[in-house]
């Protein structure tokens, strides 16, 4: 169930255009438009889904004292590496992460009530860099929907 559920979410981000690159939320996410229940109002989000058939290097920019974090989630919904907060290069491989596909999410602090601060946070988002010899392609399993739904209730799986 975990792999099917994670693949469903990965595909939803791929369908938004977030494959092999980062998509950036340029303003705080309204409460009624949150894709997960824990999104914060003082954070701008960046996200991407990557194929680790080829190593991926992500550069976290130097943000001074502004908070930024990078979270990595594999297809089994594990965080195989610690959340990263410091500037620098981080290389992800299939061996290190444990699955072919990975979700990478960034949070960048922004004052939701200050348009100038949001512009500064947007500039930081634009400095997040991705290096990869080949972006690959997204080929998640074709999970049988009825089995996947049944497994959402553990007693029926």
Question: What would you call each of these model-derived segments?
Answer:
Residues 1-157:
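A compositional/structural signature for long, glycine/proline-rich flexible linkers
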């Amino acid at each position: 169930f975990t792999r099917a559920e994670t693949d469903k979410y990965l595909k939803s981000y791929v369908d938004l255009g977030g494959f092999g690159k980062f998509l950036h939320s340029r303003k705080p996410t309204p409460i009624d438009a949150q894709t997960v229940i824990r999104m914060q109002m003082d954070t701008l989000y960046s996200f991407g889904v990557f194929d680790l058939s080829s190593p991926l290097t992500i550069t976290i920019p130097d943000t001074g004292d502004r908070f930024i974090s990078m979270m990595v989630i594999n297809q089994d919904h594990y965080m195989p590496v610690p959340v990263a907060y410091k500037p620098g290069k981080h290389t992800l491989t299939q061996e290190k992460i444990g699955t072919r596909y990975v979700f990478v999410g960034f949070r960048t602090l922004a004052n939701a009530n200050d348009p100038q601060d949001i512009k500064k946070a947007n500039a930081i988002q634009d400095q997040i860099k991705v290096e990869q010899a080949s972006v690959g392609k997204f080929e998640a399993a074709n999970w049988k929907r009825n089995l996947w739904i049944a497994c959402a209730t553990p007693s029926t799986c």
